[in-house]
């Protein structure tokens, strides 16, 4: 091969490389443009501000009000406390809630330094280890759904049975990560198939607004607090019942997706300060104007259930943004 042919060969090879590179660049740019125009542009609208974060470690127990909490796929977490990760059950594993034992709302469960503390009016404080692998794992039933929990021992059982003045012994179980959870999708197909919760009625997060409770109070003889309705997140600086329209929201780095309205039951008639049933209000009044979700049949709606799309830390005082496209 002479010099002329060698240069011709090199030129031809370089031209092919250049054409290939140019083609690749055009393809990448083209895909970028397609992605840009196919991607929905996100719009954030401020709709309120977080005024309360409430963790309910014990299902039907007293709320723990915190200034900040982790928002995980299974709900709120504050230190060693996780939302609705403790459950009172009968000896055969069926759940016991404030619907059957209204005095449960007076029981405080806290946790520090690897030990759990139970407190209640006119009761001595009871402490026990958070993790005790020697305790049995038991099968439980929450609204006819099979779940599991680790039994917290006989002393805890005796304390709760005595405080509740129960006819038969009750026991306390604790949900641990390797145990069988609830899958909300099995009860309500609108929930994501991969959602898991411990012992909540339905969802990892329930949000409501102070204005909605204020609207209800304007129709009652006695003002009620948000604590009567057991939300995870309370929002203010908005109009009543606007949470019904917040399909997709962002709070800080957390993203939540609305699934279904929170249908209210007889439990709302338990006074969280006294543990006494009224059996009428506020449920009867709610039924007169909040039968707004056919999916909840005969239950009036107050608050909304959310699934956690993106985890993070929530803070009281953070703005709430509605996401639209």
Swiss-Prot record:
Q: What EC number(s) has UniProt assigned to this enzyme?
A: 1.7.-.-
Residues binding Mo-molybdopterin: 59-60, 84, 230, 264-265, 305
What detail does the entry give on cofactor binding? Answer: Binds 1 Mo-molybdopterin (Mo-MPT) cofactor per subunit.
**Which Gene Ontology terms cover its molecular function?**
molybdenum ion binding; molybdopterin cofactor binding; nitrate reductase activity; pyridoxal phosphate binding
Its taxonomic path starts at: Eukaryota, Metazoa, Chordata, Craniata, Vertebrata
For the region MOSC N-terminal region, what residue ranges are annotated?
A: 85-175
Q: What is this protein called?
A: Mitochondrial amidoxime-reducing component 1
Q: Which UniProt keywords apply?
A: Lipoprotein, Membrane, Metal-binding, Mitochondrion, Mitochondrion outer membrane, Molybdenum, Oxidoreductase, Signal-anchor, Transmembrane, Transmembrane helix
What organism does the UniProt record list as the source? Danio rerio
> Where's it found, cell-wise?
Mitochondrion outer membrane; Membrane
């Amino acid at each position: 091969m002479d010099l002329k042919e060698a240069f011709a060969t090199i030129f031809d090879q370089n031209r092919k490389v250049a054409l290939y590179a140019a083609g690749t660049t055009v393809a990448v740019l083209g895909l970028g443009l397609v992605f840009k125009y196919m991607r929905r542009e996100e719009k954030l609208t401020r709709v309120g501000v977080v005024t309360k974060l409430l963790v309910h470690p014990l299902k039907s127990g007293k709320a723990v009000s915190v200034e900040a909490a982790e928002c995980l796929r299974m709900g709120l977490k504050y230190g060693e406390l996780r939302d609705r990760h403790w459950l009172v059950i009968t000896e055969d594993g069926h759940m016991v809630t404030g619907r059957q034992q209204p005095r449960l709302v007076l029981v405080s469960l806290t946790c520090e330094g690897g030990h759990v503390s139970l407190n209640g009016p006119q009761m001595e404080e009871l402490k026990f280890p958070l993790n005790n692998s020697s305790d049995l794992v038991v099968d439980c039933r929450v609204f006819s759904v099979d779940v599991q929990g680790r039994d917290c021992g006989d002393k805890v059982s005796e304390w709760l049975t005595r405080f509740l003045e129960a006819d038969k012994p009750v026991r306390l179980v604790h949900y641990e990560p390797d145990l069988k959870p609830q899958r909300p999708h099995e009860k309500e197909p609108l929930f994501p198939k991969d959602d898991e919760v411990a012992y909540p009625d339905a969802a990892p997060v329930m949000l409501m607004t102070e204005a909605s409770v204020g609207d209800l109070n304007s129709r009652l003889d006695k003002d009620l607090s948000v604590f009567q309705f057991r939300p995870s997140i309370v929002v203010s600086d908005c109009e009543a019942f606007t949470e019904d329209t917040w399909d997709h929201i962002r709070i800080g780095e957390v993203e939540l997706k609305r699934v279904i309205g929170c249908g209210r039951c007889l439990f709302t008639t338990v006074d969280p300060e006294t543990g006494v049933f009224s059996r009428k209000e506020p449920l009867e009044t709610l039924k007169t104007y909040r039968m707004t979700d056919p999916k909840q049949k005969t239950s009036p709606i107050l608050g909304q259930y959310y699934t956690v799309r993106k985890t993070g830390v929530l803070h009281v005082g953070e703005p709430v943004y509605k996401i639209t496209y």
